Amino acid sequence: MVSRQEQFEQVQAVKKSINTASEEVKNQALLAMADHLVAATEEILAANALDMAAAKGKISDVMLDRLYLDADRIEAMARGIREVVALPDPIGEVLETSQLENGLVITKKRVAMGVIGIIYESRPNVTSDAAALTLKSGNAVVLRSGKDAYQTTHAIVTALKKGLETTTIHPNVIQLVEDTSRESSYAMMKAKGYLDLLIPRGGAGLINAVVENAIVPVIETGTGIVHVYVDKDADEDKALSIINNAKTSRPSVCNAMEVLLVHENKAASILPRLDQMLVAERKEAGLEPIQFRLDSKASQFVSGQAAETQDFDTEFLDYVLAVKVVSSLEEAVSHIESHSTHHSDAIVTENAEAAAYFTDQVDSAAVYVNASTRFTDGGQFGLGCEMGISTQKLHARGPMGLKELTSYKYVVTGDGQIRE
């Protein structure tokens, strides 16, 4: 096993080769990575079977689905890499140019960060997405996956590096930390001078540990306590469709709805319909029904478990939904501000003034009017695959694509000027 220190030194030794690589060279490397990923399908699936067998019974079915790979999912991962090829290269982009009275020309140019560390949990697709985005944005990457997905991740990284071996980019620009202990995560948090940026992707425990302990600069990809508010002026059919999609299309992801707020004028009519759609109809279709966590008012209209205080502060990532009835738009916004992780929140309303108030007052990375929160995604936003959803305000906010993985520098051109 290569030591962490050796890996940090290896990636530092080759980072310049990717930091300054041309768009053509990077695109050739990405295509080779995608091709070798598909070519290694058999090996990746064998590794994934080992991870699945070890994880079964230890994590939920929803989380198992995150871990699971088949040939179609591997092809989708390769397709995601190829989509990055089509995106404009951000490196070298001139952001601003100005000329001073003394003749100095100041140009602000986009540049690579350098080496980016990614600590993430059991999601194999993050491996290929992270490798593709960091490479296209001119960065080397150090990956540290969760223990549950290590065999799969190792097989994926092996395939990606074999692809790079056929190009002029050194394979060491992608590094996988082989030690999955907590110590390896903490070592990355303290790797100042080796990592220029650290991005955690996972649950609240992982993210909080990185934010609280890292001395390396961090972009926080927050958890998603995502709200949908059904206003008194909502179209109920539209609301039900949005709720169904936001909660059930993929409950294990961070942009899935966790809390439903319903105006008291709508509760008596929409909550029984919601119960029919999310419980009865799903049971009839052989699908897992939604389990409700209800406040006292919501429980008058639908059956379910009484909500505890913590239910409105929980990212369930499962077929569980907290429901609260509110008396006004203002109460809904106040609740969101008290409980939201500032990821994605939505209002369903036909009232333009209510929509404007909601979008002005709710301080989240993505705020929706009459649309599912499931659109908070780099691909859906036209950014290509993403590095994560940033819930902080400095440097990057919302889906992080290529530009969010860059910095800038000033190039000052003169003709012998000196400062007097």
From Swiss-Prot:
Q: Which GO terms describe its cellular component?
A: cytoplasm
Say which domain of life the source belongs to: Bacteria
Keyword Nucleus appears in the UniProt entry: no
Q: What class of enzyme is it?
A: oxidoreductase
Please name the GO terms that the record assigns under molecular function.
glutamate-5-semialdehyde dehydrogenase activity; NADP binding
PROSITE patterns listed in its UniProt record: PROA
Pfam families for this protein: Aldedh
Subcellular localization is given as:
Cytoplasm
Concerning HAMAP family, the annotation shows:
ProA
- Report the NCBIfam families cross-referenced here: PRK00197.1, proA
What's this protein's function?
Catalyzes the NADPH-dependent reduction of L-glutamate 5-phosphate into L-glutamate 5-semialdehyde and phosphate. The product spontaneously undergoes cyclization to form 1-pyrroline-5-carboxylate.
Q: What is this protein called?
A: Gamma-glutamyl phosphate reductase
